[in-house]
Amino acid sequence: MKTFLLYAVTAVAEVVGCYLPWRWLKEGGSIWLLVPGALSLALFAWLLTLHGTAAGRVYAAYGGVYVAVAIAWLWCVDKVRPTLWDAAGVAFTLAGMAIIAFQPRV
């Protein structure tokens, strides 16, 4: 559970770090959105270093959680209800994440 929570916090940091510049560019938000966006991306990079395995495996497993957080963001922030296809995609990516992240350590 601790691993999944760390992946989720990492994903939120990345989504926020990408969303704020997107808002600035796409919706004409303040240029000051770039400051917390950059800080959030720096936090994201630092959080990735806290995962206790090889970088490539961390990135692969993290990708599944990122998809889940992005779809949650779609629903909570963008106010767009996810489709059944979105839910199925999240389920498959989380299954892949679990296979990678929780494999037996030898």
UniProtKB/Swiss-Prot annotation:
Gene Ontology cellular-component annotations: plasma membrane
Pfam families assigned to the protein according to its UniProt record, in alphabetical order: UPF0060 (PF02694)
The keyword Transmembrane helix appears for this protein: yes
UniProt main location, coarse: membrane
Cited InterPro entries: UPF0060
Stretches that traverse the bilayer: 2-22, 30-50, 58-78, 82-102
Cellular localisation: Cell inner membrane
Keywords of this entry: Cell inner membrane, Cell membrane, Membrane, Transmembrane, Transmembrane helix
Membrane topology: Multi-pass membrane protein
Entries under HAMAP family matching the protein: UPF0060
Entry's family note: Belongs to the UPF0060 family.
Protein name (record): UPF0060 membrane protein Bphyt_4776
Species per Swiss-Prot/TrEMBL record: Paraburkholderia phytofirmans (strain DSM 17436 / LMG 22146 / PsJN) (Burkholderia phytofirmans)
